[in-house]
Structure formats: C-alpha cells, structure tokens
UniProtKB/Swiss-Prot annotation:
GO terms for molecular function: heme binding; iron ion binding; oxidoreductase activity, acting on paired donors, with incorporation or reduction of molecular oxygen, reduced flavin or flavoprotein as one donor, and incorporation of one atom of oxygen. Pfam families: p450. It catalyses: an organic molecule + reduced [NADPH--hemoprotein reductase] + O2 = an alcohol + oxidized [NADPH--hemoprotein reductase] + H2O + H(+). This is Cytochrome P450 3A41. GO terms for biological process: regulation of gene expression; response to bacterium. It comes from the Eukaryota. The lineage of its organism: Eukaryota, Metazoa, Chordata, Craniata, Vertebrata. It is a peripheral membrane protein. Its EC number is 1.14.14.1. GO terms for cellular component: endoplasmic reticulum membrane.
Length: 504
C-alpha cells in the first residue's frame, strides 16, 4: 500500500501544522531587520545566513560592506547580528554603553570552567576579574618578565640559524608557533618548555589541545542553530574545550600553587604567581576579591588560547610582508642596528620605543587582523541610532572590512607602514582601527602581545633577512577559517645577515 494513501486526512493536517510551526520557529526572528528597512542577505529557516561563512568571515564581511553600505543585518541561526561600521556607533557600543548594555560577548557553546575566564565571563564577574588582573599587565610587571621572554627569542634565533645553514626554507607558523607557546607557558605557569626541540613534551601537547578548538565544529554549530542546547550540554558535562587538557591544567595549577605556597624562596614573576599574590593579598580570602583555584586555572588557559594565535600568526604575516618588501625590511633592520649596535641585547624600553618597528607591526595588524570581527551581546532592548536592537541580539563590528576600506585607507591592500608614522597616526580614527578591540573590554593582554612580538622581530631582524622562495604564495591568499589564516602555510627563505640579500 502506498504510504501517502495510508495516511488519514487528520494525519496530513497534523503534519502540515507541525511543518508550519517548525517553519515559524526557524524564522521567528528573521523579520527583525526587514521591518526596519535594514538590508542584508536573505536568511534561511533555522540556518539564517551562516552558510555564507564558507567563503571565510573576512570575505563575506567585505562583500556585505560593499553591497549594503554602513549597516546591515545577519542571522547566525536565530541570533540577529546588527552590523555597524560608523565610528560614532562603534564608540557607543564599545565605550559609552559598554557597562549598561553591551558589557558581554555572546556565548559560543558549553565552555565548562572556562566561563570563569576573563574573555568569556560576564557583567560583575568580568569586572572583578578585570580589576584583579589589570595590575599584572602593567609596564613594571612586563619589564620583570622581559628576560624570561628574551631567552626564548635567543632559542628562536639559534633554531633559525640551524635551518638557514641547511639552506632549507622555513614554515613560519611552525617556528613562531613554538616561540609563542614557549613564551605563554613560561610567563603563565613558570614552566621552561623548549617546544622547538621538544615538540612532544606533555605540556606542549596539552596546550596544543586547547588550541584545536574550532568555531565551525559541529558542537558549536549546533548551539548556533539551537541555543537552548547550551544548558543541556552543560548538564551532560559536554564542553567545547578538550576535557583532558582542562584536567591537566587544573591539576598542574593546583600542584604549582601548593609547591609555591610550601616554598619560602622568591619565585620569578609570572601570571600564575601574580594571580596567587592577588589571592593571598586579599584581606578577606572569602571576599569577592580573592581568585579561586578554578578561576586561576581558567585565566591561565585563556592566556594560551588567546595569546598563541595572535602572536604566531601576526609574526608570520609580518615576516611575509617584510620578505615581499625588501626595502621596508632593510629600513627596519637599519632602525634596529642603530638602536642596538653590534647586535646588543634588547631591553624592554628599547623594544617598545622603536618607532619604525611599531609602524611595521601596526600596518601588519591592519592588513591581517587575526580576529576578523568584534562582537557585543545586547543585554536589554535598546535603540542605536534609530535602530531597535532587542535584548538577546548581537552587535557586530567587521574589523577586517573596516581595515580594508579605501575611504579610510588609500590603497588598502598595500603594505605601507608610513600610515602609522608620527605625522599620520594622529589622523587615524581609533574606532576604525581596532586589532585588539577598544574600550573597557579591549584585550587585556595587548601590551604583553606587542612586547612579545616586538622582541621576536628585533631578535630575528638583528640576525637574518627573509626572502620569498619557490614555496611562498604570492600574492598571499587567505583561508576560510574563523580566525584569519593564510590558505597555505607561509614558507620563507632565511638568510643570515652576513649574506647579501638579493631582493624579492
């Protein structure tokens, strides 16, 4: 018997009602922007506009910016994303209304103890973490960490020298990723790991496990489509971060803390010690001021998660830009040689005060902002420049698109460090250049990241020149991943400075 004829009329009516209800549920928010005359790509039921992300967030945002203008609407599943590019609106969201409306970032899925991390936490909890952790990123504390980081700069130089002597091209992300992990694990936990020469060290393996989180993972994608699944996953103890890595760092932090509390000797400055000091110096250990062991673990892990990609990818992009612009590379080397004659060891002050080095790094971050986007969750109904934004929506700022807008940056695809010279820097609108965000919830580790990257660049530029080779992709193409990455790994020829550079 035919299945269709076997079903009664009542069954067909019931199925039709279910389908209509499912459609209504899957499109219930999709009329929000259309009613207000805000343009944007047409959303699909349940999916919204997320299928467009297969192009790459950066590319999709550029297409929308060119097609729709200053504002447009997107939907991550049911989640409305109101996209803004006007500097005054950006200022309202990231600064003026930060504490009252746009305090938090949106949830991306079940995160377990990482809900206690400064970059994920919300409202009063986030304010408390920010107040406790801000003193650990002062210039005084960073100066104390500088010698620790410098030793990994020396290891980096030694490794590159070995590769250069072999005449082999070097995959930048592999080498600079190892440098980043070494710096972050050392300054976060006080652990000396030479991951360039010990890639299978358990600490390195667990740190890399944290870094394998993919925002296009089916688990994360399911939460985008069905936000109500997040508490279900949390209840089932399902987490987007690898459990074995989380457990490893929890036990490690507890062991390190006990060891340091038992020991009377003075420990070197690292973030773990500074967080312990914040705990121990609190007048009332049960007060809101003290950091718990779980909170210390969460901050330590997020330093790895947030710091690795920014540092290693930005350094890779920088060396690519220098290799393909030998005149700029030569000018940077001249500044470094003049500031530090005869390969003198750098200091915190010399590294942070070199003007052309700062210009080169800022221009790289303009061309290649690793995060692509800034987002803030709307925690109550609000009107923003005449547009109604309901509670539960997200406001999104497309950093990559803003950094490549020819109205603000002439010849935006060209690598021109002079944009950030003393003469030109003052004319840059701070709400159009935000590689680390801006306002109260900007990246707390920005100064640390700059120090780490400037030190690495100083060390390698003192000793090497970089050239394109047969494996170098020119022009560089970007991948479709969530964070900004090259389509193919950046591979360059490393030439010791006593060898004449032949140009690109």
């Amino acid at each position: 018997m035919n299945l269709f004829s076997a079903l009664s009329l009542d069954t067909w009516v019931l199925l039709a009602i279910i389908l209509v209800l499912l459609y209504r549920y899957g499109t219930r928010t999709h009329g929000l922007f259309k009613k207000q005359g805000i343009p944007g790509p047409k959303p699909l039921p349940f999916l919204g506009t997320v299928l467009n992300y297969y192009k790459g967030l950066w590319k999709f945002d550029m297409e929308c910016y060119e097609k729709y203008g200053k504002t447009w609407g997107l939907f991550d599943g049911q989640m409305p994303l109101f996209v803004i590019t006007d500097p005054e609106m950006i200022k309202n969201v990231l600064v003026k209304e930060c504490f009252s409306v746009f305090t938090n970032r949106r949830e991306f899925g079940p995160v377990g103890i990482m809900s206690k991390a400064i970059s994920i936490s919300k409202d009063e909890e986030w304010k408390r973490y920010r107040a406790l952790l801000s003193p650990t990123f002062t210039s005084g504390k960073l100066k104390e960490m500088f010698p620790v980081i410098e030793q990994y700069g020396d290891i980096l130089v030694k490794y590159l020298m070995q590769e250069a002597e072999k005449g082999k091209p070097v995959t930048m992300k592999d080498v600079l990723g190892a440098y980043s992990i070494d710096v972050i694990t050392s300054t976060s936990f006080g652990v000396n790991v030479d991951s360039l020469n010990n890639p299978e060290d358990p600490f390195v393996e667990k740190a890399k496990g944290i870094l394998r989180v993919d925002f296009f993972d089916p688990l994360v994608f399911s939460v985008v489509l069905f936000p109500f699944l997040t508490p279900v996953y949390e209840m089932l103890n399902i987490c987007m971060f690898p459990k074995d890595s989380i457990e490893f760092f929890k036990k490690f932090v507890n062991r390190m803390k006990e060891s340091r509390l038992d020991s009377k000797q003075k420990h070197r400055v690292d973030f773990l010690q500074l967080m312990m000091n914040a705990h121990n110096n609190s007048k009332d250990k049960d007060s809101h001021k003290a950091l718990s062991d779980m909170e210390i673990t969460a901050q330590s892990i997020v330093f790895i998660f947030a710091g690795y990609e920014t540092t290693s990818s930005t350094l890779s992009f920088t060396l690519y830009c220098l290799a393909t612009h030998p005149d700029i590379q030569k000018k940077l080397q001249e500044e470094i040689d003049e500031t530090l004659p005869n390969k003198a060891p750098p200091t915190y002050d010399t590294v942070m005060e070199m003007e052309y080095l700062d210009m080169v790094l800022n221009e790289t971050l303009r061309l290649y902002p690793i995060g692509n986007r800034l987002e803030r969750f709307c925690k109550k109904d609000v009107e923003l420049n005449g547009v109604y934004i309901p509670k539960g929506s997200t406001v999104m700022i497309p950093s990559y698109a803003l950094h490549h807008d020819p109205q603000h940056w002439p010849e935006p695809e060209e690598f021109q460090p002079e944009r950030f010279s003393k003469e030109n820097k003052g004319s840059i609108d701070p709400y159009l250049y935000m590689p680390f965000g801006i306002g109260p919830r900007n990246c707390i580790g920005m100064r640390f990241a700059f120090m780490t990257m400037k030190l690495a660049l100083t060390k390698v530029m003192q000793n090497f020149s970089f050239q394109p080779c047969q494996e170098t992709q020119i022009p560089l193409k970007l991948s479709r991943q969530g964070l900004l990455q090259p389509e193919k790994p950046i591979v360059l020829k490393v030439v010791p400075r006593d060898v004449v550079i032949t140009g690109a």
